[in-house]
Amino acid sequence: MLRNGQNQAQLLARSLGQLARGMASSKRVSSKKEDLKPKLPKPPTVEIPMEEPLNASYLSKTLGSSYRSWAAALEKHPELKTLKRKDLLSSYDTLKSLDYSVDDIIAKPMIIYYGATTLANRHSVLQECGFHNVTVQTLAKYVTVVNKPIEVLKAHNYIPFDVKVAERLAGYFKDIKLPVDLRELESETLTLKSLRQSLINAYLRERLQMDDNDLQKLWRVYTRIRHKSFRAVQDTIELLTKEFNFSAERLRKNSFLLYSEADNVRRILREVPTIDSQDIREIGFRRPKILMSTCDSLKQTLQHVHAFGISEDAVLRCLEVLTLGPDTVLERLRDLQEIEEFQVLGTNPRILRLVHYQNKARLRLDYLNQLRVRCASLHILSCGSEAFAKFARDGSDRTKGRDIVVYLSNVLGKDVQVLRNLLSRHPNWCHIPLLHVKQCLEYLRSKKFKLNEIFANIHLLLYPIKRIEEKMLLLQSPDAQEDLQLPVANFDSLSNNEILTLILYLIESEFHFTGDGIWTEQHTHHVENFNNLLPDFPESLNKVYKYGVKPAEKMIMERL
């Protein structure tokens, strides 16, 4: 249909004749019932709860102590007011489990500003080093303390004089012989920080076969590992190797996992055992960064995804979304409904790529709009920087049609390949933006055309709504009915299917059945002239990581 002008004109004329004969003999009776087809999910009313800043009244009622004490603490440390209540309660529960009272916390109120995991780790480190009484004051000064020489800590009675710190720390490494001479580490002029780092280096050399380069990167990039207890590091490595089948090499390449919490990972195994029937162990192995998210965050993120009618299969197509915070995911899911070009992709199985890359996608969409590029596919909005730069420079205002066929498959309930085969009969179908297809379909639905009737005339979705309206009005005029020699008394005698077929015929007859009827006046021969209209690609793309182009890719940009 519409491939070659003259041949297609003959085909359409023949079809019109058959249509007329069919109308003369009998009128097709429309079905009373129409199968319900899935539509784009409506935005659910999921809101991020708004919290009031922490105040003395809430703290005194929730944690205890007097209103006056907390008021004084908040006045002295106003940054405490920015703490989220769930984080506050989590830190308080940890401090409580470590036998600190509310009065202890009031004495050093900023202690509760630290995260629960940080507090637990630091307390464990000090215990491993031989501190016989870890007070809340000591815990609050943790960074200062571990940077002190061991002899100074013993002189101030933090560590008993008879404790051999190096030997004590080495003893926490079980079932492994450290490749280090402890006699070289017995000097009490060493700081706790340097002693612990020497021992953890020896352990990682033996357990994960890390070399000097691996260790240098570890301490340069993932410095927080030095604040994790030896027992916790070993527990994490054993869990990852046994439950997730991580090899030593894979752990070296993803050394940030050494800071993951073993107890949290165990919770994930128990409470999120599968995603769309796929074992969480396989998922964690594929995307190790997911294991750095808390179990509660993963569960909440999945709840938000479900609330917006997005399947878990979509999660598997973009596992990176699980590395975002749940509040961020919820906010971005809601934002999808605010931008028409994003909202129309709501049923696309790769929709979560727009959630993960939303900031980049917004910038790219704005930039392409400035270039008057209408066909911005989900892939182009979320692909790598090099691919996007090439697309923008080439100036080809077209897609491969995947977004269109996926959308129509969800709405019409038809096979993707069937739709592609039908649409590909039109030479220009890939030059039509998905948003227009959606708007045209909604327009036809508003005129009471059924989905099966639209499917039978699917190419009409590619045409400007204004032209469809014009031809629909034209068909209602007696002159047009006479010119077309329709064997019916009036317009109302035509079936919906016949009306759509005639509209398509009338539009393309003006363009000699070449398929050019899809272009509006603003976009006539848009593709052919696009390269002449394309402005210079902005230099900012080579300097600032904007629209997805990193500074390191400047040479690539120059070659494009």
UniProtKB/Swiss-Prot annotation:
Compartments reported by the entry: Mitochondrion
Disulfide bonds: none
Transit peptide feature, positions: 1-23
Disruption phenotype: RNAi-mediated knockdown is lethal. Most mutants fail to develop past the L3 larval stage, and the few pupal escapers do not develop past the late pupal stages.
Region of interest: Disordered: 23-47
GO molecular function: double-stranded DNA binding; nucleic acid binding
Superkingdom: Eukaryota
Keyword Transcription regulation listed: yes
UniProt main location, coarse: mitochondrion
GO BP term (any one): regulation of DNA-templated transcription
InterPro entries tied to this protein: MTERF (IPR003690), MTERF_sf (IPR038538)
A cellular component annotation (GO) from this entry: mitochondrial matrix
Stated family: Belongs to the mTERF family.
Role, per record: Binds promoter DNA and regulates initiation of transcription. Regulates mitochondrial replication and transcription. Required for normal topology and maintenance of mitochondrial DNA (mtDNA) levels. Regulates mtDNA replication by re-activating replication after replication pausing. Likely to regulate replication pausing by coordinating with the mitochondrial termination factor mTTF which promotes replication pausing.
Subunit structure: Probably binds to the mTTF-DNA complex.
Annotated protein name in UniProt: Transcription termination factor 5, mitochondrial
